[in-house]
Amino acid sequence: LMKRYSRTVAQQCRYYEVNNIFEYMVETYQNGNITTFGELYRELCKEARKDFIDFLLSEVEPIYWREILKMTV
């Protein structure tokens, strides 16, 4: 498979056939697929990465923040 980089939210939603790529990413992490989560995050463009952090802090339970944030750096 070709590596995917610098993808927008819309591109990722289409590619993975999901309505909300950020929800999909969080669910992937919560299901224990940590490596897959990291790959999904790295595929996002810079602006989408910022939007993901906003989503994380506003829509995801705080108990998950620390571990998910560690995976983004």
Predicted regions and their residues:
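Short amphipathic alpha-helical interaction elements located at domain edges
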Residues: 1-73
